[in-house]
A protein has these predicted regions:
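C-terminal segment of N-terminal export signals and the immediately downstream linker at the start
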Residues: 26-44
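Beta-alpha junction/loop-to-helix N-cap segments that form part of ligand/metal-binding clefts
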Residues: 51-58, 70-148, 222-229, 254
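Short, charged, surface-exposed loops that flank catalytic or proteolytic processing sites
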Residues: 347-360
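Extracellular/periplasmic periplasmic-binding protein-like sensory domains
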Residues: 140, 260-336, 348, 407-426
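Solvent-exposed, acidic/polar segments of extracytosolic/periplasmic ligand-binding ectodomains
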Residues: 290, 365-427
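Extracytoplasmic "Venus flytrap"
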Residues: 40-63, 85-91, 114-115, 188-199, ...
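N-terminal secretory signal peptides
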Residues: 1-11, 15-20
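Extracytoplasmic ligand/sensor domains, especially the bilobed periplasmic-binding protein
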Residues: 107-219, 269-294
């Protein structure tokens, strides 16, 4: 965090598309000065969900550098202020900072990322106040349905791009089918937005897994930051669970997995959402981190480029590592894409002084980004468009302690695999 971005780094802006994108963004001499445009950005930068915000400073710093003196919209150059706020991994705090950005700072556009505990309260504030907003890094069902979204109506000013539960279910089943097990799945679903959506008996994992021939053992919801999972572990052992899945926050998975090892519970597969997205979360498990599997939304191997800079996913991730001395993380690409989408909408809006015009521009988005194509012309419900999802497994790395290998790409064959799912060690 806090590292500087240098857009003149050798090789980062080589792509011709990047040069064209920058020429369209950077002001020319003949452009008149426009009023400042304010963009609010909210994410969890501290607290148990801080891993999602680890790359924020790098991404935001890069966007600021790319914009230079401003964003050219028709014949005017508008200085752009990016107001970054920390949700502190708390829904109430997220709503509070969003309200201040809207009512006190008078932002023109809101960007928000990472888990329902941040995206939902911020999106709700924007919807109530008619503020254009784009969100991501949250499955679409917890974002849309938990906010009271109606498939035949949708929302007025809030839009979202990410994958859905149907995608992660498909990815997990595809990975599990490649390993011989008894098809008994133990579920760790917390009592939060993600856990309740994943465990929903009508729209979540249970009916889909049953249809695929898997038996689900659900010991019930548990509160985040639980320090004793003995009850769940005992249930899984009694029911002969060989696959564990769930969507715990990172510290809870660390607690569960270490206690499971201590108590002799050794499943063949552990496919966990949210908690295993980040290298440092896997490193916290020590040797027990080898073989963990998870959903993968973005990697340096993804075949996409930034519409702002022309940088490929590989170049972007490499620049992050050079600048921060840290391993890439999945939110890196999506946070950048949020700004790609937001700036593109502002450039196309009929008037930046008309919030309705900005909303209309968001709705009309048709943009190839660092995470793939974004267009709300098609989606499972109004205000939602989906991005590709694959499955990956953590293993010993060459230059890093653990590295990600894509092991399932059935739903996105344009993203290459690097191996097959390995069963976890049983001793």
């Amino acid at each position: 965090m806090g590292q500087r971005w240098r857009v003149d780094r050798r090789g980062f802006l080589r792509a011709g598309a990047g040069a064209a994108a920058l020429a369209a963004t950077w002001p020319g001499r003949a452009s008149a000065q426009g009023r400042p445009i304010k963009i609010g950005y909210v994410s969890p930068q501290t607290g148990p969900l801080a891993g999602f915000g680890e790359a924020d400073t790098f991404v935001v710093g890069g966007v600021r550098k790319t914009l230079g003196k401003g964003l050219k919209i028709r014949d005017r150059v508008h200085p752009v202020e990016i107001l970054v706020r920390d949700s502190q991994s708390d829904p109430n705090r997220a709503a509070e900072v969003a309200s201040r950005l809207i009512l006190s700072d008078k932002i023109d556009l809101m960007l928000v990322a990472s888990t329902p505990e941040t995206t939902n309260p911020v999106s709700d504030q924007c919807e109530v106040n008619g503020t254009p907003a784009v969100s991501s890094v949250c499955p679409w069902q917890p974002w849309f349905l938990a906010r009271g979204g109606k498939p035949d109506v949708g929302f007025k000013s809030t839009y979202h791009f990410f994958w859905g539960l149907e995608d992660i279910i498909g990815v997990f089943i595809d990975m599990w089918n490649s390993v011989e097990t008894n098809k008994v799945v133990g579920a760790l679903w917390p009592n939060d937005g993600d856990g309740n959506a994943w465990g929903d008996k009508e729209r979540g994992f249970p009916p889909a897994l049953a249809k695929a021939g898997y038996k689900v053992i659900d010991p019930g919801r548990y509160p985040n930051l639980t320090d004793d999972f003995s009850s769940q572990i005992a249930t899984f052992k009694r029911e002969k669970v060989e696959i564990v899945t769930g969507v715990p926050i990172p510290p809870d998975w660390t607690t569960f997995w270490k206690q499971a090892a201590q108590q002799g519970f050794r499943p063949k597969v552990a496919s966990i959402g949210k908690a295993l997205l980040f290298p440092r979360s896997v490193e916290a498990l020590g040797d027990l981190g080898d073989g963990m599997s998870t959903e993968v939304w973005w990697t340096p191997q993804h075949p996409f480029k930034s519409s702002l800079t022309g940088a490929s996913a590989a170049a972007f991730a490499a620049e992050y590592t050079r600048e921060t001395k840290k391993q890439w993380t999945q939110p890196l690409g999506f946070i950048h894409a949020l700004f790609e989408v937001g700036l593109d909408a502002l450039k196309r809006a009929a008037s930046v002084d008309d919030k309705g015009a900005i909303v209309a521009a968001i709705k009309a988005t048709n943009l190839n980004t660092l995470v793939g194509p974004i267009s709300w012309a098609k989606g499972p419900v109004p205000n939602v468009t989906k991005t590709p999802l694959v499955g990956g497994q953590w293993g010993r790395g060459k230059d890093v302690r653990f590295d990600m290998t894509i092991v399932s790409n059935r739903s996105a064959p344009n993203i290459p695999t690097g191996g097959k799912l390995r069963p976890l060690k049983q001793a």
